[in-house]
Amino acid sequence: MAAAANTSAVFASPSQPLSSKRSFLYSSRIGPILRRFPRKKLDLQVKAVATTLAPLEEIKEYKLPSWAMFEMGTAPVYWKTMNGLPPTSGEKLKLFYNPAASKLTLNEDYGVAFNGGFNQPIMCGGEPRAMLKKDRGKADSPIYTMQICIPKHAVNLIFSFTNGVDWDGPYRLQFQVPKRWQNKPIEFFNEGLANELSQDGACERAIFPDSNVVPTRCTMIANLTVEGGDRCNLDLVPGCMDTNSEHFNPYANVDDGSCPLELSDSDE
C-alpha cells in the first residue's frame, strides 16, 4: 500500500512551506547513499532513489492506523510514542513497518532498510539504515522496527523503505511542536535543525535500529564495577552468596559483601 494512497493535507510547516533555499541545510552531512548496495545493481538503485524524492507537496501525511490493520497487512506503517501522545518534537518514537502491506518484496540477504530525514526527504547521515527484523512465526510475515529520537526543531519526518533495489514510499509523519513555536516560520525550524544535526553523532542518535544500540555504561550497585556495555542487560541481584551463611540469598547472583565474616581462633 503506497503512501500516495493515504489522505491528508499537503506538506506544511507550522506556518509556511519549506523553501528550496533551506531544504539542504544539512545536506553537507549526506554521504554516498548507495555505497552499501552491490555495484551490479547501481543503475537500479539510482532509478529507485529518484522515486523517493518526490516534490514535497505530493507527499501526503500518513495517518496512524489501528494495530489490527497493521498486523493483518492492510496498513504498512504503525508507530507508538513513549508517552502515548501524538508524535511530538523532542520526544521518542518507535516506527513499525509491515512489508506485506506494500509491494516491497523481501530480500533475505539485504533485509529492509529505512531512509528518512527531518523536514525533507533526505536521509539524515547519508545512507539507508538496516531495520530490526521481528519474526512472527511461520504463519505471519516479519515486521521491522526503527527507533526515532525526534529533534526539537523537526516538524515532520519524510521516509521510505527499501529492500536494496526497490522502494516503498515516501511517507510523511507530522510532529506536534511546542506551543511557543507554533507561529514560527519554517526558517526558524530548519536553522535550529541544522544546528542540532551538525553535532557529532547527532544523526546516529536520532535514527537507529534497536539492534545497534549498546549501552556504554551500566547502573552500578553499591561498589560493584560492571565492565562493558554488552553486559548492561544482566539482571543483577546483590546479596550474600555463601550457602553456609544464615544470610544466604538464593536469588543473589552478585556477592555484595553482606555475608558476615567468621573469625578463626587465631584472629580473636
Swiss-Prot record:
The keyword Chloroplast applies. Keywords: Chloroplast, Plastid, Stress response, Transit peptide. One of its GO terms (biological process) is chlororespiration. Disruption phenotype: Normal growth and photosynthesis in normal conditions. Intact NDH complex, but altered NDH-dependent chlorophyll fluorescence increase after turning off actinic light and lower capacity for nonphotochemical quenching in high light intensities, due to altered nonphotochemical reduction of the plastoquinone (PQ). Increased sensitivity to photoinhibition and long-term mild heat stress. GO terms for cellular component: chloroplast; chloroplast stroma; cytosol; thylakoid. Its main location: plastid. Residues 1-49 form a transit peptide. InterPro entries: RCA-like. PANTHER family: PROTEIN POST-ILLUMINATION CHLOROPHYLL FLUORESCENCE INCREASE, CHLOROPLASTIC, PTHR32429. This is Protein POST-ILLUMINATION CHLOROPHYLL FLUORESCENCE INCREASE, chloroplastic. It comes from Arabidopsis thaliana (Mouse-ear cress).
